[in-house]
Curated annotation (Swiss-Prot):
A Gene Ontology term for the protein's cellular component: plasma membrane
Pfam families: ABC_tran
Compartments in which it is found: Cell membrane
Name of the protein in its database record: Teichoic acids export ATP-binding protein TagH
Major subcellular site: membrane
Species, as recorded: Staphylococcus haemolyticus (strain JCSC1435)
Reactions accelerated catalytically: ATP + H2O + teichoic acidSide 1 = ADP + phosphate + teichoic acidSide 2
EC numbers: 7.5.2.4
Classification of source organism: Bacteria, Bacillati, Bacillota, Bacilli, Bacillales
Tree of life domain: Bacteria
Sorted UniProt keywords: ATP-binding, Cell membrane, Membrane, Nucleotide-binding, Translocase, Transport
UniProt membrane topology term: Peripheral membrane protein
Subunit structure: The complex is composed of two ATP-binding proteins (TagH) and two transmembrane proteins (TagG).
Length: 264
């Protein structure tokens, strides 16, 4: 299978300011030193056609930062990401404008993706039918529940038939019937040899669905490999982590975060 996504030594840094004075000083003095947070640090992953890669890790590890970078909404500070094909990101609120109705969001998002109005008109009924939103499709998205927003976002993205699909916790909300319908659609994409990045805390879904695992911990790629090789290690880590007291869990997270801050 040919390479669909190549993530090369990607790092994402954020300057941390305690107040506006520090922010202004940093802007005026290029070599000014300040606290820098590494959301991701030197991550490299190669994905091929047909790969379904589970991005796993505890909250705050950097999974969503990586998924947004794959989708193109965030640029790396260093390194690069090569994508061979159209990419769609499915996340709660991803690409949705709360002031627009469901229909208007469909039109707007598809126009941004390069679809012509005639094509949008042809695809619109499919999106609406898949979403199961009924008359709510004509209401402003700001009035939607998180589950309804996820339904709309998922429906748009699967209808446009992307080559590379990034799913960031979008199946963690909504009813079970719709979630199963989404999973069935994702299986179709898997059978069509599309590349899928699947961000989820649902280990059962990850085990059922993914072929490879990228374990992100403290902004670094701890392990990347076949599902059978990496997932058991991550599951054991979760078991051990959950046995810790709340104080020990907090200390563990704090230890990881401290390593991600440097002055530069």
């Amino acid at each position: 299978m040919s390479v669909s996504v190549n993530i090369n030594n990607v790092t994402k840094e954020y300057r941390i300011y305690r107040n506006n004075k520090e922010r202004i000083k940093d802007a005026l003095i290029p070599k000014n030193k300040n606290n820098t947070f590494f959301a991701l640090d030197d991550v490299s992953i190669t994905a091929h056609e047909g790969d379904v890669i589970g991005l796993v890790g505890i909250n705050g590890s950097g999974k969503s930062t990586l998924s947004n970078m794959i989708g193109g909404s965030i640029s790396p500070t260093s390194g690069n990401i090569e994508r061979n094909g159209e990419v769609s990101v499915i996340a709660i609120n991803a690409g949705l404008n709360g002031r627009l109705t469901g229909v208007e969001n469909i039109e707007f998002k598809m126009l941004c993706m390069g679809f012509k109005r005639k094509e949008i008109k042809q695809l619109m009924p499919q999106v609406i039918e898949f979403s199961e939103l009924g008359e709510f499709i004509h209401q402003p998205v700001k009035n939607y529940s998180s589950g309804m927003r996820a339904k709309l976002g998922f429906s748009i993205n699967v209808t446009i038939n992307p080559d590379i699909l990034v799913i960031d916790e979008a199946l963690s909300v909504g009813d079970q019937t719709f979630t199963q319908k989404c999973l069935d659609k994702i299986y179709e994409f898997k059978e069509a040899n599309k590349t899928i990045f699947f961000v989820s805390h649902n280990i059962r879904q990850v085990r059922e669905f993914c072929t490879k695992i990228a374990w992100i911990e403290g902004g670094k790629l701890k392990e990347y490999g076949d599902l059978e090789e990496v997932l058991p290690k991550y599951e054991q880590f979760l078991k051990d982590f959950k046995k810790k007291s709340k104080a020990d869990q907090k200390a563990f997270r704090k230890g990881l975060d401290e390593k991600r801050f440097i002055v530069k």
